[in-house]
């Protein structure tokens, strides 16, 4: 298979726009599954190594190093949390009575997500569900912190609420954004592990009087999480370097119809301060 689009490349590093559904590295149990690093090694040689990972279902910026010195320098930034990562997610805002059953529901008095909020909950492996993570309220797990900003809010004709959210993980745990949003009562649309599988955003859910066909597909038939931006210090210039992955077409379509048919209230504010 051809390589995903290259967002940036020089002699020290290369950034790809990873599509949803593609593993970053070989699967532990099924070595035959297609993965990005297998494609990269076949096309660019085995000296290229990924600095970090994205979930298979998450799209967006994936950075690789082209040499051992670059790998060590960039990996050190991730380990010391000196990178800036921005994700975007379309979330299902659970009704208040349903949200109260989750770990740490976050709501305004009107029952919507606040303009900005922070989730500070430790995460660890969910032994009852292999391959998944869970929140640890008191003991156990590893410290985990995420800042969120609500960019837009939407209400479908049936009353179901959605929100377009900017996510800034300040730690880098497995499934961090997915678990933190679910814990806040706003699981990511299309999340088969931590979400609400019965909620599938279709045009017929938004457009009054429109009756879709029996085989109508969701507007966004995937995990609605995209790694939009990654900023690191360049291995050679030592200057901050930002890489941006454009929003996938299916996100643009879903947002277009939500803005057109969903009663919403946008929010434009300053980004949280850099750290």
Please name every model-derived segment.
Residues 1-275:
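RNA pseudouridine synthases
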